[in-house]
């Protein structure tokens, strides 16, 4: 008999890890351990903010050393549990490794609204957003230097879940379905990670006119009738900041028209990995994703995809008067 594995959570600040992991632990009858709570307690004892403790930990290995050993001991115990930790995926070999993401502005809004200690208060949305980015980068750099692992690399995980618009209940149901083998088990088994993405945050790489010429009139209704779980996973690339379609524009369009907040996908390439013909994900995005393509896709689906930084787009990508260009 196979012993059920643990579930370990990492993710963006403000992505809802605590809310989701607490409920999943209750639903599955598992003990939950939060390393974030431990770090916050350590910061309060030192009268530091979480960011200050992160920066201090870059110089003082004792901070991470204590927490690392705790995680190693828990992983070695073989106990089936839910672990909320930014590095548990590195220590737990036999676990469902979940990484939760959200749009940075939405993450800042959530953090700004939740109760916090006096050391963690922010005066504005922009300050919260900037501090969250700074704190995340501090952690990322520390992990790269100390452990030689990059927490931003999606292939470290089994399941990526975007919580920008999806509610906690929907996210919880999807994660439990994946854990129990009821959601895209082939992707999880053979080619993780499984991506559960917000369709309104995925960039097209084809012109909407071309898509309309090939659109199957029944596809929108077929997707609505089937539900999002049976939807064939899209094939997706990732620049390190933006997700984009490699294959599956019609399914993505149908999901948007049906109001889905999550769609399943498999990762084709991320950052420097090749998409097609040796072209990296970053270069493919720059070659295929034009301001006019973004503008027309957004207008057709009633969404607001932001223009990426000009450096991520091809030559002359943002021109005065071009659709989607800033005024």
Where are each of the predicted segments found?
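Short, charged/polar connector segments at secondary-structure boundaries
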Residues: 177, 181-326
């Amino acid at each position: 008999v196979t012993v059920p594995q643990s579930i370990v959570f990492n993710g963006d600040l403000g992505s809802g890890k605590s809310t989701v992991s607490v409920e999943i632990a209750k639903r599955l009858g598992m003990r939950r351990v939060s390393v974030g709570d431990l770090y916050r307690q350590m910061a309060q004892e030192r009268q530091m903010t979480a960011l200050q403790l992160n920066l201090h930990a870059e110089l003082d290995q004792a901070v991470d050393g204590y927490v690392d050993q705790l995680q190693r001991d828990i992983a070695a115990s073989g106990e089936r549990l839910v672990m909320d930790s930014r590095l548990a995926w590195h220590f737990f070999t036999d676990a469902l490794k979940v990484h939760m993401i959200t749009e940075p502005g939405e993450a800042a809004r959530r953090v700004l609204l939740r109760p916090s200690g006096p050391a963690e208060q922010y005066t504005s949305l922009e300050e919260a957003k900037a501090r969250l980015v700074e704190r995340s980068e501090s952690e990322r750099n520390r992990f790269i230097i100390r452990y030689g692992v990059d927490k931003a690399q999606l292939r470290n995980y089994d399941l990526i879940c975007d919580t920008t618009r999806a509610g906690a209940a929907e996210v919880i149901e999807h994660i439990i379905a994946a854990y129990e083998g009821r959601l895209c088990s082939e992707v999880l088994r053979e080619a993780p990670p499984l991506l559960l993405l917000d369709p309104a945050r995925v960039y097209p790489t084809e012109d909407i006119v071309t898509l309309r010429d090939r659109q199957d009139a029944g596809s929108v209704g077929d997707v609505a009738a089937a539900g999002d779980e049976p939807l064939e996973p899209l094939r997706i690339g990732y620049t390190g900041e933006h997700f984009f379609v490699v294959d599956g524009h019609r399914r993505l369009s149908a999901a948007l028209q049906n109001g889905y907040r999550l769609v399943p996908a498999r990762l084709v390439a991320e950052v420097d990995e090749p998409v097609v013909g040796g072209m990296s994900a970053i270069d493919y995005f720059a070659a295929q994703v034009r301001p006019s393509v973004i503008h027309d896709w957004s207008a057709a689906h009633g969404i607001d995809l932001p223009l990426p930084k000009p450096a991520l787009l091809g030559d002359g990508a943002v021109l005065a008067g071009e659709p989607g260009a800033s005024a």
